[in-house]
């Protein structure tokens, strides 16, 4: 047993007293990573929120249309691109740990190529937003405006895919502060841009969508300039290379499950709001569920940052052949997630009677939101655990296993449970959210079991094999003739 522990196999028991210094060091590394990643998530999330806020001053109809178009864009485009790009958490993270620095730029270029191609059919879907919304029963006037808004957002889908690639590329190198800076500059300028395009240009609500596109592209340009000219990226970015066009299929084998992991989860939450419209008193139920979803989404930024830190630390250590340190990183991030979720959950419960006032002055809505807050607190606890465990999965390259667990959790357990509670037992919107709680329990249990019984020595070997097989050039000395310096 003692030998197994020394080799880093399976056991995830908590650190011994003698390991306190390494635990402290690991906590510092993860907080140093997760803090900026949380800030980046919030700043990029604010981009869409700011646009919708400006549109809200034009009237309720444009506001409804912009909100629906934004939600439609998230479901049909942004979630897929974010999930696909998360394959770089594994590939770039492990390559950086193995000191195969040239591979990071190649892997990012592969991802850029794939995501740009994927954006073409997604943009066609966005161009037909109006027809699709009408087909699914949306009000014609809202669908028309939403379709117009989505068309002006089409350039943003190409930028968003590239932006995700740059984010993961720099994150894998533990170089996240430039991402925070560029996101901060972009979001600050976005406020001015929205004001000009919405109120001064004559574009009206379409100006907000165009502002999204411009801001995303501005962020991409800023990050590209940093990557190209910064000395910190001189080893990982050596210019565009034809090598990136090889081995696309191995990349897709990891990218497709990565996309499914994210999409299956995000789609279930959007389905929650759609189903709330079928309940008795749909206006109240939809309003309250939207408030809960917005609150939950904002709180989710914290465990999402921890998840990014976990995937980076674990992939780096596995790539470097340090299974024991990778296992320690898992222990530490789980402890941080538990502590964070207890604090956030306590705050949610303490403010339950006043939180609804931030969204509505109607007492019925405020009272309903107050009754939902303890459920949200429980959901936040479970969501924090599943987030960091999903980060562990990405760091190890378990995206296929994660996609299977997410499929079973949300669509075999969560959605059916929510439907049963909401419509058969007449629990209403609480029942739909309790269905998500059931899904999170199964998801945490499944990912937790996989993590607990992991042979970390074996994972380190798999990382080495993945790095060696990801390019036909084993030592990755890229031929100068295959590189275009730009």
From Swiss-Prot:
Q: Which InterPro entries match?
A: MATE_euk (IPR045069), MATE_fam (IPR002528)
The protein's GO terms of the molecular function aspect are: antiporter activity; xenobiotic transmembrane transporter activity
The record's subcellular location field reads: Membrane
Q: Which GO terms describe its cellular component?
A: membrane; plant-type vacuole; plastid
Q: Which residues cross the membrane?
A: 35-55, 68-88, 117-137, 142-162, 179-199, 207-227, 259-279, 288-308, 331-351, 365-385, 401-421, 433-453
Q: Please indicate if the UniProt record lists Transmembrane as a keyword.
A: yes
GO process terms (BP): response to nematode; xenobiotic detoxification by transmembrane export across the plasma membrane
Q: How does it sit in the membrane?
A: Multi-pass membrane protein
Coarsely, its chief localization is membrane
Q: Name one Pfam family in it.
A: MatE
Which UniProt keywords are present, listed alphabetically? Membrane, Transmembrane, Transmembrane helix, Transport
Report the domain of life of the source organism. Eukaryota
The record's family statement is: Belongs to the multi antimicrobial extrusion (MATE) (TC 2.A.66.1) family.
Q: What protein name is recorded for this chain?
A: Protein DETOXIFICATION 16
**Organism lineage:** Eukaryota, Viridiplantae, Streptophyta, Embryophyta, Tracheophyta
What is the gene called? DTX16
